[in-house]
Amino acid sequence: MAFPTTEILSALIEPLAASHKFDLEGLKVTKAGPKSAVAIKVDSDSRPDLDQLEVFSQEIGELFDAAEQRGELNFGAGYTLEVSTPGVDNPLTLPRHWRRNRGRLVALDQDGRKRVARIGALNDAETHVVLIERNKKLLEVTTLELAHSPRAVVEIEFAKPAQDETALAESTFDEATA
């Protein structure tokens, strides 16, 4: 039996991730003999902490071991298991990514033009998101259709955001766009 593929491992991991209320955000399998690795990225609306990731990692290890004993998986000479969250440099590609980063700054790269905005609420259908941009002293509110979203990555912010921006980011989609 060959080293397991991402498809096979995803089918095993996803039910366990769901039981922890995690979304499987990434899975990378690197086959390199005794230095093989399985890197798993999970996230949730409540942001997993280190203790939760440790428990999840142990359960995945047990799941893989049991599947190997049954002959369903073969990791060969062994592997390293890495479990983490995606991190801030992960592009925002799904509505849940935007929802989880509400209130944070996002860098949007559209047609070679970069703009920075604060993420507001999503509409009920999760097809559009509010973006808040500061133009001198005024706040400008626009909406972005997620289906046509440019590359978007959370910006690290060291200063506390202005109160008016925070309040607008916390308002509902309808309130912000009224």
From Swiss-Prot:
It is found in: Cytoplasm. It holds the Pfam family RimP_N. One of its GO terms (biological process) is translation. SUPFAM superfamilies: YhbC-like, N-terminal domain. Signal peptide: none annotated. Its main location: cytoplasm. One of its GO terms (cellular component) is cytosol. PANTHER family: RIBOSOME MATURATION FACTOR RIMP. HAMAP family: RimP. Required for maturation of 30S ribosomal subunits. This is Ribosome maturation factor RimP. The lineage of its organism: Bacteria, Bacillati, Actinomycetota, Actinomycetes, Mycobacteriales.
